[in-house]
Swiss-Prot record:
N-formimidoyl-L-glutamate binds at residues 140, 315, 317. Keywords: Cytoplasm, Histidine metabolism, Hydrolase, Iron, Metal-binding, Zinc. CDD domains: Imidazolone-5PH. The keyword Hydrolase applies. Fe(3+) binds at residues 68, 70, 238, 313. It is found in: Cytoplasm. It comes from the Bacteria. Its main location: cytoplasm. Binds 1 zinc or iron ion per subunit. This is Imidazolonepropionase. The gene is hutI.
Length: 407
């Protein structure tokens, strides 16, 4: 690529709308790295001969980060949506053999090509909203071959699309039918066979567990964390979504990158997260879709200074959401977060939730030039508009990878 100066833009380099530069420029070298940024009037003379790209006054933010998704799976769960509308709870559906296990059946039956095509269709709306990094979990295979298949598809998405994909092994997502009544034996399989094999194959960037009364116990969760730690893999946790099971405190003991959901999180768990540097990942799409009523403890998270990230939690059962911008709106309207909080929640804090704050979530000299240009009058509009296409252009590694067609 040619060294390029992107100019005539309004710059929000760290995802905070109070830290901006009007009439700014970003100089990107031939490697796709940011060589300089600041006010256009201060552009050093050494960049005068570089190619120019005029963004016509657009707002520019770091590329967005969707730090919690289940993007690869087979089938849908539209039938369960109808059940919930009729009053059947998420937990009851799971106990009846639906929920995660129904998606497991569909995912096991699908081949890699089918899973790739379906996941690619889910990914593309996110890319058109400025997402340049995404986490994708396994967890709908629940056996070695199927978990491998999911993680391979996730890796392929990162190779075939202009997005950085981080994979999370979520083998301890639910108990597969063949292990009914034998949860400890299944955890043996996860820890002794599945995790080591998939890690050795280079398919795992982090490890997650669903710690809940309809998921896995604290003791079982700790076994998975121990297995991950032995292999040098960071951990994450689905925690405190349906009850206060104490998973967050356990996650903090293992210095988890993040604890996610957190509707029933208590102050002791928050204090543990703060001490461990664990990010709180809130998932308003799931809260909305299954009509939860217990709000995450936003005020306590603020009080203790725990960084808050937001994510789509895209999945077929509780958050079939393909819009990170709608997630921003939900963070404000449902969780009563501020615009600066939600914007940082999908940039710097989302990057921290992946352990990649040094690579994503900010625009700084020496970093890869991943950014999005927005046709808005103010950054608050990113959380304000519902359903309007706002992203004009996405640049990854200094190369334009998306431009909105007008007219």
């Amino acid at each position: 690529m040619k060294p390029t100066v992107w100019h005539h833009l309004r710059l929000c380099p760290h995802g905070h709308p109070d830290e901006t530069i009007d009439d700014a420029a970003i100089a990107v070298d031939e490697t796709g790295t940011i060589a300089w940024l600041g006010a256009l009037s201060a552009l050093p003379h050494g960049y005068a001969h570089w190619q120019r790209e005029d963004l016509h006054g657009a707002w520019v933010t770091p590329g967005l980060v969707d730090c919690h998704t289940h993007l690869v799976y087979g089938g849908t769960r539209a039938d369960e949506f109808a059940q919930r509308l009729a009053g059947v709870s998420y937990e009851e559906i799971a106990r009846q053999g639906g929920g995660i296990v129904s998606t497991v059946r569909a995912t096991r039956a699908a081949d890699e090509t089918t899973l790739f095509v379906q996941a690619a269709a889910r990914l593309q709306p996110l890319l058109a909203e400025g997402v340049t990094a995404i986490e994708i979990k396994s967890g709908y295979g629940l056996d070695l071959a199927s978990e491998r298949k999911m993680l391979r598809v996730a890796r392929q998405l990162g190779e075939r699309f202009p997005v950085t994909v981080y994979t999370t092994f979520l083998g301890a997502h639910a108990l597969p039918p063949e292990y009914a009544g034998r949860a400890d034996e299944y955890i043996d399989e996860v820890c002794d066979r599945m995790l080591p094999t998939l890690a050795d194959e280079g398919l795992v960037d982090a490890v997650d567990v669903f710690c809940e009364r309809i998921g896995f116990s604290l003791a079982q969760t700790e076994r998975v964390f121990e297995a991950a730690t032995r292999r040098g893999l960071p951990v994450k946790l689905h925690a405190e979504q349906l009850s206060n099971a104490g998973g967050t405190a356990l996650a903090a003991r293992y210095r988890a990158l993040s604890a996610d959901h957190l509707e029933f999180l208590d102050e002791a768990g928050i204090e543990a997260m703060k001490a461990a540097g664990t990010v709180a990942v809130l998932l308003p799409g799931a809260y909305y879709f299954i009509r939860e009523t217990q709000l995450p403890p936003i005020d306590l998270l603020r009080k203790h200074g725990v960084p808050i990230a937001l994510a789509t939690d895209h999945n077929p059962g509780t958050s079939p959401l393909e819009s990170l911008l709608l997630t921003l709106n939900m963070g404000c309207t449902l969780f009563r977060m501020t615009v600066p909080e939600v914007l940082q929640g999908v940039t710097r804090h989302a990057a921290a939730a992946l352990g990649r704050a040094d690579r994503h979530g900010a625009l700084e000299v020496g970093r890869q030039a991943d950014f999005a240009a927005w046709s808005v009058g103010s950054l608050a509009e990113l959380a304000y508009w519902i359903g309007r296409p706002l992203c004009e252009q996405v640049v990854r590694g200094g190369t334009p990878v998306f431009r909105r067609m007008n007219g």
